[in-house]
A protein has these predicted regions:
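"…together with the soluble PPM/PP2C metallo-phosphatase catalytic core" -> "…together
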Residues: 2-274
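Membrane-proximal soluble regions of multi-pass membrane proteins
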Residues: 22-25, 29-40, 271-317
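Short, highly charged low-complexity linear segments
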Residues: 136-138, 234-238, 261-264, 283-292, ...
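Juxtamembrane boundary at the C-terminal end of a transmembrane helix
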Residues: 328-336
Length: 336
């Protein structure tokens, strides 16, 4: 019956996100036009360039996922009522993972609104953005500590699980770094949804392998929502997830493993995001030190564009990287 709950969560996530996408595309287009002070569509000269692809599509993911997780968890509890009073605090872990993911998504919404209002792609200033991301990470860690679910160590290849006192600080830094890395992936058609979809499938499998099968309703619901969102975000995109979708996906990849005590799994699962963000970090550091760029373009998807790769091939390439990260995560889980 719990398998039925996972299927129900995935199907409902797909259906709700697909329905919301049909509604959100025209609404977000009008919102962007209004906030930027543009003229109505019929008054725009037809010779002018087409309007930019609407962003903030991550709101579809957030709403669809929340409803689907609720339905999936109710189905799981109906099949196994002991989940409500489990000594492993299944419900507390699920709620904390949801809250943390939505907290990062809310930071992304604020970032997207700042992008629209300022007529630039820069969004929020770095200091307040990092402060909000750090607050979201601290919220997750604090709630886990209060509920007695905060992991006190980490899994290392060849050594297994070892206790590590500064682990909470490491996990907080990891969540913020992952959010920043995922943020720069926005703009590449379909890649955020495609890579996050692979990561969610991996988390479903890993939670089953590690004994957290009921909590797989969250990645199942988000996987269904991401698959539906690809109907609009697959190249050529008609709707982008925006910063809110990127940070929402990053929050899920970071918070779900953390809440089951295996935060280190988010490192390989987010491999494409680390490459995107790491390339930007190297570009900035090298330019400040040498006065010239290290790469012809950054992040990774821009570099691939510069080399003449099509948007569809970039999508497939980054999804392949995500599959490689999933394979590494499976290998890491075997040491647990």
């Amino acid at each position: 019956m719990i398998r039925f709950a996972l299927i129900a969560a995935s199907v409902q996530g797909f259906a709700l996100t697909a329905a919301l996408g049909n509604l959100m595309v025209p609404l977000l287009r009008e919102l962007q036009r209004t906030m930027r002070g543009a003229q109505p569509e019929q008054e725009i000269d037809r010779k002018e360039p087409e309007e930019p692809v609407p962003t903030i599509g991550g709101l579809c993911l957030m709403v669809g996922t929340l409803a689907a997780v609720g339905a999936g968890w109710l189905a799981a509890c109906a099949a196994q009522p002991s989940l409500l009073g489990s000594d492993r605090q299944m419900m507390s872990r699920l709620l904390i993972a949801l809250l943390g993911t939505f907290a990062f998504g809310a930071v992304g919404v604020a970032d997207d609104l700042a992008c629209i209002r300022s007529r630039s792609a820069l969004g929020m200033r770095r200091a307040p953005r990092l402060a909000l991301e750090a607050a979201a990470a601290a919220l997750v860690l604090g709630l886990l500590a209060l509920s007695g679910c905060l992991p006190a160590g980490l899994v290392l290849p060849g050594a297994g699980y070892i206790r590590f006192a500064p682990a909470p600080l490491l996990w907080g830094a990891l969540l913020v770094a992952l959010a920043e890395a995922a943020r720069v992936a926005d703009g590449a058609d379909g890649t955020v949804c495609g890579t996050a979809f692979v990561a969610m499938l991996g988390l479903m499998m890993l939670e089953t392998q590690l004994g957290w099968f009921p909590l797989a309703v969250f990645p199942a619901a988000l996987a269904g929502a991401l698959m539906a969102f690809l109907l609009w975000d697959f190249p050529p995109a008609k709707l982008h997830p925006g910063k809110c979708g990127c940070l929402f996906a990053a929050g899920a990849i970071g918070c779900i493993p953390l809440c089951i005590g295996y935060a280190e799994l988010s490192v390989p699962l987010a491999l494409p995001f680390w490459l995107e963000g790491g390339m930007v970090a190297l570009q900035i550091l090298f330019y400040r030190r040498r006065g010239r760029p290290l790469f012809a373009a950054a992040p990774l998807h821009r570099w691939l564009e510069k080399r003449g790769m099509s948007a569809v091939n970039i999508f497939y390439s980054l999804c392949a990287l995500s599959v490689c990260g999933l394979a590494l995560a499976v290998c890491l889980a075997r040491w647990a």
